[in-house]
Amino acid sequence: MATKFPKFSQGLAEDPTTRRIWYGIATAHDFESHDGMTEESLYQKIFASHFGQLAIIFLWTSGNLFHVAWQGNFEQWGQDPLHVRPIAHAIWDPHFGQPAVEAFTRGGAAGPVNISYSGVYQWWYTIGMRSSNDLYTGALFLLVGAAILLFAGWLHLQPKFQPSLSWFKNAESRLNHHLAGLFGVSSLAWTGHLVHVAIPESRGQHVGWDNFLTTLPHPAGLAPFFNGNWSVYAQNPDSASHLFGTSTGAGTAILTFLGGFHPQTQSLWLTDMAHHHLAIAVVFILAGHMYRTNFGIGHSMREILEAHRAPSGRLGLGHKGLFDTVNNSLHFQLGLALASLGVITSLVAQHMYSLPPYAFMAQDFTTMSALYTHHQYIAGFIMTGAFAHGAIFFIRDYDPIQNEGNVLARMLEHKEALISHLSWVTLFLGFHTLGLYVHNDVMLAFGTPEKQILIEPVFAQWIQASHGKALYGFDVLLSSADSPATSASQSIWLPGWLDAINSSSNSLFLTIGPGDFLVHHAIALGLHTTTLILVKGALDARGSKLMPDKKDFGYSFPCDGPGRGGTCDISAWDAFYLAVFWMLNTIGWTTFYWHWKHLALWQGNAAQFNESSTYLMGWLRDYLWLNSSQLINGYNPFGMNSLSVWAWMFLFGHLVWATGFMFLISWRGYWQELIETLAWAHERTPLANLVRWKDKPVALSIVQARLVGLAHFSVGYVFTYAAFVIASTSGKFG
């Protein structure tokens, strides 16, 4: 007899209802809960799956390179990056009429194409790619890499090649190899690529597989390196009149500290970036030799943590017991990794626009908007995931005896203070921010705009001034000619930095006023509310006054009922579910702010943002409504244009989003009644009743219905705003 899905759970496979299918899907990746799973097997399966993950990433990137090389216009774009629109790939659609064919035939293409808003053209150009052949070579290399990784994944599932549990638990060796190898050597390799390939290409000298071993990246060769005269590599940098990709105005330096941006490309100097990666490589390769392994020298993580005890005694036993707690809990490790990755992803969003690393990207406004929005949303989802796995750790892996008296136990012991403080902060921020906005709305509605409460962000302006922004007239640190900070850096990076920070042609330290002050606090409200829900969910995951035995019910449970009132909606999963709504809310406000501020600056109309952002109607009318008008009228009986696909996606996104509410508002009983009625009708309908099923139809649990609702809400939300950002920006700037 064929075994039924799911093979990993005998109990579910024997369930006579459709629960078998839905719970099977829901627990497919919860490896810990699978039949016969041992700790060693769990680690081995996860380890092997990493190779598959990397293979998928390589395959995807290979596909990007291949399609641009085959159907794109990379070489034409390289001739004139500011005026040629980069093509992502061709479109073949049997539904296209002649108007659509004409509308989507752009960028010098022969037929309909999609425009690239991902920044890959700028990235590939910056790192030294110039021809479609370069792209094909990269695609082929990644394809081979993906095949090798798939083989490695298969290999590590074979008994002879499965690492042992002790290998996975060897934290010091892993740290050394990841720090020195993963971060250090890869940064060194990237420095090598920048110095040997990207910098010469930026100066009009081609370097390829045919000549990279014979082309010196610097006229002096390696002599200055060996005789300690390293400053030679920083002499004669590219001049301010350098034309990127040509020898006009080019220098010979390879490792510099110029500061600021290349005047033509408005991106960071390639030689500065090479220097940065070299420094990172040195630091991480050193760090990768710090931990004690076979040779009995270096740090022991366990000893460091055991020794971490506050002299005052106010932190109890400090970090005692944390080494084993972290090292034996995959959820703890995943939580830490996701929290770090979430922060880094948000920093990427921030730095990608304020310090653009890729040539000509800063002048491609739609790409800048898309990349900021994309990375902030990704960061939001990753950060909520960090707290989800933190909560699962507390339920499944936390050992109260092993952690008695240490900082982790003390976190749990004073959780009421943490949660109530977060609650106080959110109430304060919410009432005051909304109060200011609403007051200003009322003043405008009553015809007295001069009675608005407008607060200058003086502290933030002071911080900007201390970094060298002269506009506000604060005479402090880098904005003061007499400051030691100014004189110390005068001969190296400071002139380039000061030029950049005081220039109106980039997004470095934008001028801020009362509108920024208000939206900053609105975003702070969103961040603190999201944090409150997530922190409360994790700290109450093991139990609360209302439900002291909560941990016995697992991570996600609908209720302990009937008969035990108030236990619905308090699982740690429910906290995650609620937090995602607030996270989306917050990222929405953040991206609205970024996008509107930049639209105003790019259009040379900063006053629009400054005047309209101080009251809510301004946001609704002058940002959302004004910029969605093209989308709302994107296609009609009289015709369509190249924005019509975004107009349709805008509509479709709203529909997906609205579908979410159907699952969020109606609960299990409604669906059970509906399903039973539909099953009755199906069995009595000719032809339809030829299709039978053995499983008794059972509605999803409340938790699963909430998941379906949340998924639709999130996907619809993201689709709607993606279409809005791309269409409203590309509609104005091309």
From Swiss-Prot:
One of its GO terms (biological process) is photosynthesis. It is found in: Plastid, Chloroplast thylakoid membrane. Phylloquinone binds at W671. The gene is psaB. Its EC number is 1.97.1.12. PROSITE patterns: PHOTOSYSTEM_I_PSAAB. Keywords: 4Fe-4S, Chlorophyll, Chloroplast, Chromophore, Electron transport, Iron, Iron-sulfur, Magnesium, Membrane, Metal-binding, Oxidoreductase, Photosynthesis, Photosystem I, Plastid, Thylakoid, Transmembrane, Transmembrane helix, Transport. It is an enzyme of class 1 (oxidoreductase). GO terms for molecular function: 4 iron, 4 sulfur cluster binding; chlorophyll binding; electron transfer activity; magnesium ion binding; oxidoreductase activity. This is Photosystem I P700 chlorophyll a apoprotein A2. GO terms for cellular component: chloroplast thylakoid membrane; photosystem I. The chain crosses the membrane at residues 46-69, 135-158, 175-199, 273-291, 330-353, 369-395, 417-439, 517-535, 575-596, 643-665, 707-727. Chlorophyll a B3 binds at M662, Y670. PsaA and PsaB bind P700, the primary electron donor of photosystem I (PSI), as well as the electron acceptors A0, A1 and FX. PSI is a plastocyanin/cytochrome c6-ferredoxin oxidoreductase, converting photonic excitation into a charge separation, which transfers an electron from the donor P700 chlorophyll pair to the spectroscopically characterized acceptors A0, A1, FX, FA and FB in turn. Oxidized P700 is reduced on the lumenal side of the thylakoid membrane by plastocyanin or cytochrome c6. It catalyses: reduced [plastocyanin] + hnu + oxidized [2Fe-2S]-[ferredoxin] = oxidized [plastocyanin] + reduced [2Fe-2S]-[ferredoxin]. Chlorophyll a B1 binds at H654. [4Fe-4S] cluster binds at C559, C568. Gene3D superfamilies: Photosystem I PsaA/PsaB (1.20.1130.10). Pfam families: PsaA_PsaB. P700 is a chlorophyll a/chlorophyll a' dimer, A0 is one or more chlorophyll a, A1 is one or both phylloquinones and FX is a shared 4Fe-4S iron-sulfur center. It is a multi-pass membrane protein. Belongs to the PsaA/PsaB family. It comes from Nephroselmis olivacea. The PsaA/B heterodimer binds the P700 chlorophyll special pair and subsequent electron acceptors. PSI consists of a core antenna complex that captures photons, and an electron transfer chain that converts photonic excitation into a charge separation. The eukaryotic PSI reaction center is composed of at least 11 subunits. Its main location: plastid.
